[in-house]
């Protein structure tokens, strides 16, 4: 039996897309910028290669502070030197990032990836017994965590004897706010129990500023990350993704859309990095496309609206409840949405009626973007590369 006509049309469209992707010497893009093919590169190699054509630009942002690509790379290299010289980390080792969505997690991911270290992303609000289980099962060589969330884990990490890298909100605070932030953090840390083996993120960077160490290259088949997902039934599952898996997301998504103004066009990251949706699409994809990423440690609909109005936001990915809250938050519906070109949602279904209402709002504000659905927060990374207006 022949397939229905609409299926034949979609197959033809898929053929055109495939041929387009592999045309022009395997470079995706149009205009002034192109996305390089993934080759055998690891994630950090791919980031460097994909973004070198853009020069220096604002790569990441923490609230009001923007960080240039050159500074971002310098932080990555300095932290890689810390991991190599202080902890002796090497290819195949595992290191745990136990942080909310922040700039330090991105720096840590690329620094560890440079060395060939597998990054185990763990939900930062899990109870300390679960943290112990993940650290022990992966034989993790250390843990990066946020000072504000560290109190309940001091005994566990001291018992395990693993070195701790402590992040603070002040690490990337704007100059006028840094002193006040450090004062408040100092008060809290004074009353918190103490880690036996601890280095602060800022001191690690300062100690190894401008230091460079050799890394691993062309190891695309190596495992890059462990993502500790919840699964649907039974015990939680650990997803292992290779460098190639992670790099294919920005490579394929670049066909759907590419950056027009490096460092000016931005994406607010409202998803965690312990899911591929947050790490690969919201984080790695936006960074490799020279978008300015604005990580938020917790979802705040009013703050998202504020950032939308102050920045040129071109992409947003999230879960259904986030988009529902945004839809009902005063000020989200407005002309600032006209800059948006991509929106993806995963983790659960949205009702057809809500999708219609939300997409009507987007159309009303002059954007061709539509809210596109995926599946789980990890599985959504595959359909996001093909689920377009076609």
Task: Label the model's feature ranges.
Residues 86-90, 208-221, 226-269, 291:
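Conserved adenylate-forming
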Residues 39, 65, 80-129, 270:
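Conserved AMP-binding/adenylate-forming
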Residues 314-317, 327-390:
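Gly/Ser/Thr-rich phosphate-binding loop
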Residues 110-115, 137, 275, 285-288:
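Short hydrophobic alpha-helices that are characteristic scaffold elements of the AMP-binding
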Residues 247-266, 274-315, 329-330:
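Conserved AMP-binding/adenylation subdomain of ANL enzymes
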Residues 6-7, 114-203:
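Structural core segment of the AMP-binding/adenylate-forming
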